[in-house]
Amino acid sequence: MKQKVVSIGDINVANDLPFVLFGGMNVLESRDLAMRICEHYVTVTQKLGIPYVFKASFDKANRSSIHSYRGPGLEEGMKIFQELKQTFGVKIITDVHEASQAQPVADVVDVIQLPAFLARQTDLVEAMAKTGAVINVKKPQFVSPGQMGNIVDKFIEGGNDKVILCDRGANFGYDNLVVDMLGFGVMKKASNNSPVIFDVTHALQCRDPFGAASGGRRAQVSELARAGMAVGIAGLFIEAHPDPDHAKCDGPSALPLDKLEPFLKQMKAIDDLVKSFDELDTSK
């Protein structure tokens, strides 16, 4: 079955092409740390031959606690992104939370991301669509895979069909997430075979029901990522940090930065194997 291709400059994203890595840090903690993390990702992905897009947030507007670190904000964040692009020649993905942010962000980065909690907000979707940028839609934890087609339709009606879908798990009772591996195929079918990627970092979240920040299960990042890659998907979304225990956001789910290369070697081996198989139709 023909898979839709979404192009991010010279990077082609599709379910049957070699996987694209969307990776970096959860939130911009500082200019220097962003440079360090981006350089490491670029070095490793170039060594392994993996197409790469750098990820970071300039504002974490959905933190659980009013006291939690949110980021440097729009103006300073765009300056850091511009420096990263100039220094490393890297593509960049970041999220927007308000309609007014869509165009200023799209003027700097290559992919704008629709956060899971906001994925059904039509005014935001329409503003993002109008930019003409490539869009990454995070599947909300409370939305079934089949319903993602409706969100894609909103973008298409807004004049933008350059849409990538991203799964980050579903609510399983209170304060826990699980990933339904069958959901990747359902999302492909619901969106006319749009590229589907897997956010393994945020799928590892779990939390103290009375706590002010998310916990995580980073010890299981490899096994969960291996399972997702075995399905056959367009890309992997993974955040890393040189000192996860002291990260300003989602450290418990972050991959230790020094584990990035061995981790990606596993992911590439699985992706290469799975995509070497002929398509097998078992529906008849």
Swiss-Prot record:
Assigned GO CC terms: cytoplasm
**Which parts of the chain are coiled coil?**
none
The yes or no answer to whether the keyword Lipoprotein is present is no
Q: What is its EC number?
A: 2.5.1.55
Pathway annotation from the record: Carbohydrate biosynthesis; 3-deoxy-D-manno-octulosonate biosynthesis; 3-deoxy-D-manno-octulosonate from D-ribulose 5-phosphate: step 2/3; Bacterial outer membrane biogenesis; lipopolysaccharide biosynthesis
One Pfam match, given by its short name, reads DAHP_synth_1
Localisation per UniProt entry: Cytoplasm
In the UniProt record, the signal sequence range is none
PANTHER family named among the record's database cross-references? PHOSPHO-2-DEHYDRO-3-DEOXYHEPTONATE ALDOLASE
Q: Which family does it belong to?
A: Belongs to the KdsA family.
Name of the protein described by the UniProt record:
2-dehydro-3-deoxyphosphooctonate aldolase
The root-end lineage is: Bacteria, Pseudomonadati, Pseudomonadota, Gammaproteobacteria, Enterobacterales
